[in-house]
Amino acid sequence: MSSSSRPGRASISPFRSRRTSAAGGGAGVAAAAHPPPARTSSGGRPSTPSSSSSAAGGGRPTTPSSSSAGGRPTTPSAAFARSTTPSSGRPTTPSSASSRAAGRAPPVAAVDAANAKENIMVTVRFRPLSPREINKGDEVAWYANGDNMVRNEYNPSIAYAFDKVFGPATTTRHVYDIAAQHVVSGAMEGINGTVFAYGVTSSGKTHTMHGEQKSPGIIPLAVKDVFSIIQDTPGREFLLRVSYLEIYNEVINDLLDPIGQNLRIREDAQGTYVEGIKEEVVLSPAHALSLIASGEEHRHVGSNNFNLVSSRSHTIFTLTIESSPSGENDEGEVKLSQLNLIDLAGSESSKTETTGLRRKEGSYINKSLLTLGTVIAKLTDGKATHIPYRDSKLTRLLQSSLSGHGRISLICTVTPASSNSEETHNTLKFAHRSKHIEIKASQNKIIDEKSLIKKYQKEITCLKEELQQLRRGMMGNGYIPPTDQEDLVSLKLQLEAGQVKLQSRLEEEEEAKAALMGRIQRLTKLILVSTKSSISSNVSGKASLRRRHSFGEDELAYLPDRKREYSMEDDDVSLDSEFSVEGKLDSNNPDESLRFDRRNRRRGMLGWFKLKKSDQLSGLSTSVDSESTASGSPSFSRSSQQKHPLLDLKDGRRKSMTRKGDDPALTDSFPGRTQAGDLFSAASRARHHLPSGTTIVDQIDLLQEQVKMLAGEVALCTSSLKRLSEQAANNPDDSQIQEQIEKLKNEIDEKKSHIRVLEQRMAQSLETTEDPAIRTEMSQTFSKLSTQLSEKTFELEIMSADNRILQDQLQAKVSENAELVETVAQLRQEIDNLLKTAKNEDNVASMQSSEPSSTSSNPRDLANEVASHSKMPSRTTEDHTESPLKSQVLLQAAEIENLKLDKLRLAEEKDGLEIHSQKLAEESSYAKELAAAAAVELKNLAEEVTRLSYENAKLNADLAAAKDQTRSSIQSDTKRRDQENGIFVEELQKELVASCQREAVLEDTLSQRARRESELLKVIEDAKCHEHDLENELANMWMLVAELKKENSQEDLFQFKATQNGYHSSKSDTGRMMSGMEASDNRNWDGVSVSTYEEAKAAYNVQRRRCKELEGIVSRLKGEDLRGLDVKVLEELQNFHVEALSKICQEKMANQVL
């Protein structure tokens, strides 16, 4: 790029998504639109950006992620639809393929999804240039070239291809739909999934994963999607558990449980896990998001040069999903999967200029991210033998995911700024390496508890049948007197031991069955099912027993609609439009803006969901909000403060939060909803279809939680009512305050009635308890309540002692204050007296001074004389000594000044004492309120203790009756066993005789079998000897055949024809012989041939007889039941010998013919 075009880059928009510079002319655009395939070396490896840029003479860009010339496509999306040019088989990038004309569309080769290897899905998201970067003069160094390419502005030859590249204007909803939705859907089907964001600090990782009010992140969208899938899946039951942890300075902390610090990583057959991590069962999106918000409160954050609120730790939000078929005739398969949503801390360079603790945190963050990069490099290398998972806690926890067990989606967040060009390049290299990791996603299935129960039931039935068969067999055998008393006793002991063992095994199986049934019943209430399966049953009026816990559309309505994120014109629907201008903080104050950002960041995931609810106190004025929150009761919990965000403000900083609160009609038409009210309404709605496996204790626990929530809301409304009453006393003519007071009173009465209804339901549940197991649980609950009662009593005693001490201190201060008031009054009287005396003395002095003035003729001379007296005291002392009256006046004036100072000091002390007494009065009133509340709670606990003691007495009576019944049944069982023992001894004797007979028969059978086996072994040895002889004779015959060949090679003289045994011989024509051969010579040759034929015939007959013998032996062996002999081997030997003899005879005939 020429230097003349660089000055124009200062005006580049931060939302720029592709290079549009005209300096390069048409060649640059063509290169960007049609990048050529990658250049490969001789070994077929893809070229790096540096090598490709140095090798390309014309500056043609290459793709680093491309493979060899005839190999795989450049992008993972091309694994499913690969584009090839007609001239060569080289793959092209999706940008080049999309830019081709429609008429020249290349052929598409479909790849079977079952056989294709699946890789990690890697996406890149650009954030826009920040105002700080724009003010600093940064330029766009990296940009998105199409939907799958990232290019460098200064070196177009450096380009990377990924599954998807998101520009700066892309919404988080769009990122979730492409990068994370398939992972969430797979997790709901039993496939483990992991989604994590990677990038440098201040690149937008936390914004992508958590989001804000206007644009929710991946985690809240995934939570919404999970519950939406459950709602759309009426055929399955789901159980959801969540855990939330952070890795801070290589230490694992539990964010849901602040006590869980420095946890350890363990490993079992299923993979790695964190020991002692807290898991919460969630029932709704609100519940899950509230847990995330509470976990964010404990996460470590800090500030650096790039970000005011920077994440200083890695966080892992794990959602464990269990699902099973909801039908009764299911196969018992349970799918178990984990969805890990990870927000990594950003890598830091020296540009952050951190010191002290921040530098230490950055070193740990860089170390873990470096280990993650090393592990990914080792995984993609293919030659590495050791992968350093244990070098970092992060890679240790990600070992199962990086090993390929589940789906992984990597979202790399990058900044296009030129000042971070090197960091962005490193992030792209990391993403490029991660793309080559292969994964094998498969469903995780476990055996359901119901199937285990069926298995145990079948096994118990089989054991009982075996026991019955054993007893029937012992009863069926005849009686034979025992031959030996010792054998009888030993057999009896063995049978008793076997019976005891069998009985204990049956008891263990029954206990295991009962434990599993109890676990199933306790977990039934935590199972989530869709409400779509119960529509028809609700219409017909029949209660569905399969419905555990369901959530409706009102729960999902709190979350923003998916379609809202696709359009940028729906800002009027967003929550920011509901905030008034007065509620915004002053951006000029950096401290308040920092606190505002931090508060918004922590509540960002719940703010957009909670603010959808209309506030029950939206009609309150600004002064009421500020006063009620500034002096709220300290007994309110943090959860109650989170439920009412309008009451969380201090000093009136936030005014009216919604525009709906300004209109009283809207306030009346949309009454406020609270969490406790929702729970109460849900409990009242579900009263007719309680779950079949829910125990009384679980119901009581749920009702107690609802009562606690309602009590907190009642306390909050009472505090607001108190503030409004004070305002009404000051402004009795304000009708709006009176209406609000009436509303609050009605709401308090309604909540109290709800509390009474819940307490009545708890009492009814306790009265209808008849199950012994539930009674045992009630006794345990009673012991816990008694312990809590003792603790509360102790705390109350401590509070009363503190109250007495405070009252004593208050009385002492009041007495001191009274003494000080008396002292002040006395001092005032003394001051008045002194002032009166001083006035009198002044009058006397004036009278004395009037006498010399009358003697003087001129007043001016008298004034000059007085002035001279005042200027020259020595002169006055010489003329006249100072009178004692004037000295007294001066002393009294000094004393008056001291008294004035003492008066001011005493006034200040009085004000301080009044303030202190006021504080003590407030503390005393607060202590009285606490004492009253404690007295009420103590009264309730006493009533509950009396009720539980009554129940305990009932249980003790039932237990005594059960013990008496058990004792009587044991006595009857002992008598019956004594009667059965006599019969059992006779049965044992019979069984002993029958076992002796069976042993004798078995010994005879074994001896006969041993003899037969010995005989068979002898026969086999004989057969082997025969086989050896046959082999020797066969060798002799081959020698004979060789001799015959030598004799017949000289001349073909004779031909023989054998009429017996199928042999033929004839004399050959003697026309070719010499005319001088005599007949005697012919006779001699004829004799030799006849003798050779006779020998061959004899040998053949011998071999034929032996073959018949072997056939007879084989047939006899086949007729016998001999499992130890190999009949096939004997038949193969027989066939071999027959073939050998036939070949010998054929050779003989052929030689004779020749």
UniProtKB/Swiss-Prot annotation:
Region span, Disordered: 1-109, 620-674, 838-885
GO molecular function: ATP binding; ATP hydrolysis activity; microtubule binding; microtubule motor activity
UniProt record similarity statement: Belongs to the TRAFAC class myosin-kinesin ATPase superfamily. Kinesin family. KIN-7 subfamily.
The keyword NADP appears for this protein: no
Domain Kinesin motor: 119-437
Lineage of source species: Eukaryota, Viridiplantae, Streptophyta, Embryophyta, Tracheophyta
GO annotation, biological process: microtubule-based movement
Keywords for this protein: ATP-binding, Chloroplast, Coiled coil, Microtubule, Motor protein, Nucleotide-binding, Plastid, Transit peptide
InterPro entries named in the record: Kinesin-like_fam, Kinesin_motor_CS, Kinesin_motor_dom, Kinesin_motor_dom_sf, P-loop_NTPase
Compartments (UniProt record): Plastid, Chloroplast
This protein's record includes keyword Lipid biosynthesis: no
Name by which UniProt lists this protein: Kinesin-like protein KIN-7E, chloroplastic
Gene Ontology CC: chloroplast; cytoplasm; kinesin complex; microtubule
Record: residues binding ATP: G199, V200, T201, S202, S203, G204, K205, T206
Listed Low complexity bias regions: 1-14, 29-109, 628-640, 846-857
Coiled-coil annotated residue ranges, if any: 441-523, 734-761, 801-845, 894-967
PROSITE patterns: KINESIN_MOTOR_1, KINESIN_MOTOR_2
Transit peptide: 1-21
Gene3D superfamilies in the cross-refs: Kinesin motor domain
